[in-house]
C-alpha cells in the first residue's frame, strides 16, 4: 500500500456520503459499561440480569424460506430459492441485530455485550433487561411480518458474580427455551 493511503470508517450510518468510507453496523447500545451502575438502576431487589436470545429455526428459514411448497413443478417450487435472496435475507437480519437494536433499547438500563447474526447477549438492571427482551421479541416479530420468532434465557445475578459463569448458566436456560413446542419462549431464573 502506498504511504498516502487513508482508510475511513463510519459507524451505524445508513446514508451514503461522498467520502469513500466503509460503514460498519454495530449493535453497541450501552446505558453503562459498569455493572454496578446497571445494578443500581434495578427496582426492588438489586440485581443484574443476563439475557441471551437466539432466532428460532433460522437455518430452516434460509433453506426453505423461499421455497413455494404449493407448487408441484420442481422448477416453480424452487423459483425463488437463490443466493441473492439468501444474501438479502442475511443483510436484513444483520440490519436488525446490528443497527435497529440500538434504538429499540434506548432508555433502558442495559448494555449489549454482543448482537449480530441472529443472537443477542445483554446485561442490565434486571427489570430493564426483561423489558429489553420483550421489546426485541415484539419488534423482531413485526420486522419479519410474523415469520420469525426468538427464544431467550434470562437469569438474575449479584453484580459481583462472574460474567462468564452467568453467561454459561443463561445459555443453558436459552437451550431449555428452544425445547418448548413452537419455541418463541423464554426460560427465566431456572423455570421454563
Which stretches of residues belong to each language-model region?
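Regulatory/sensor and coupling segments of signal-transduction and defense proteins
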Residues: 1-192
Amino acid at each position: 500500500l502506498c504511504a498516502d493511503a487513508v482508510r475511513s470508517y463510519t459507524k451505524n450510518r445508513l446514508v451514503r456520503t461522498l467520502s469513500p468510507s466503509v460503514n460498519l453496523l454495530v449493535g453497541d447500545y450501552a446505558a453503562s459499561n459498569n455493572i454496578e451502575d446497571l445494578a443500581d438502576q434495578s427496582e426492588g431487589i438489586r440485581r443484574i440480569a443476563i439475557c441471551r436470545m437466539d432466532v428460532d429455526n433460522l437455518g430452516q428459514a434460509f433453506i426453505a424460506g423461499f421455497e413455494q411448497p404449493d407448487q408441484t413443478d420442481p422448477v416453480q417450487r424452487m423459483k425463488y430459492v437463490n443466493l441473492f435472496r439468501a444474501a438479502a435475507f442475511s443483510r436484513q437480519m444483520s440490519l436488525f441485530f446490528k443497527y435497529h437494536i440500538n434504538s429499540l433499547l434506548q432508555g433502558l438500563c442495559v448494555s449489549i455485550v454482543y448482537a449480530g447474526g441472529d443472537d443477542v447477549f445483554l446485561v442490565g438492571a434486571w427489570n430493564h433487561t426483561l423489558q429489553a427482551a420483550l421489546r426485541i421479541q415484539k419488534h423482531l416479530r413485526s420486522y419479519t411480518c410474523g415469520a420469525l420468532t426468538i427464544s431467550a434465557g434470562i437469569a438474575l445475578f449479584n453484580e459481583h458474580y462472574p460474567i462468564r459463569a452467568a453467561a454459561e448458566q443463561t445459555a443453558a436456560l436459552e437451550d431449555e427455551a428452544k425445547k418448548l413446542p413452537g419455541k418463541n419462549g423464554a426460560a427465566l431464573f431456572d423455570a421454563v
